[in-house]
């Protein structure tokens, strides 16, 4: 499982890794990006990996499908919650069930949902044609005593 964890998370931490990845995405794609991270401390290693991998896949989807001009990434970790939200102002799409997404070849969205749910989180996707996409991954975490 360690081989699935990007080394950059151990080298620089989640916040810096996200900022680096989003910055590189912005330079490559021309999409203007905003990143806001508010974490009280380091997250569990597995959760850091999930957040990073979901972000990677979400940005890949934006580059391939969204025709977006702006992207916002917000990561909040306060108390017993960690919430990731990634929004774009792209073309959006008609909401569909997981089975319809797979049938239509949208494996990335399904993979993100499965990754989040396997980590005990909740995945939410809000979109409409012409209204961009908002992706949320929400996790309950143990608070150190």
Residue ranges and their predicted role:
Residues 1-145:
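Coiled-coil dimerization/phosphotransfer module
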């Amino acid at each position: 499982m360690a081989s699935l964890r990007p080394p950059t998370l151990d080298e620089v931490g989640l916040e810096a890794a996200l900022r680096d990845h989003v910055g590189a995405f912005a330079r490559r794609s021309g999409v203007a990006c905003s990143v806001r991270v508010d974490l009280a401390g380091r997250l569990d290693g597995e959760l850091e990996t999930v957040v990073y991998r979901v972000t990677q896949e979400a940005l890949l989807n934006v580059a391939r499908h969204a025709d977006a001009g702006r992207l916002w990434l917000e990561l909040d970790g306060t108390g017993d919650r960690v919430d990731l939200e990634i929004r774009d102002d792209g073309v959006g799409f008609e909401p569909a069930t997981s089975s319809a997404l797979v049938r239509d070849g949208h494996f990335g969205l399904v993979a993100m949902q499965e990754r989040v749910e396997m980590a005990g989180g909740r995945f939410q996707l809000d979109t409409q044609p012409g209204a961009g996409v908002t992706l949320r991954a929400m996790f309950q975490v143990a608070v150190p005593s």
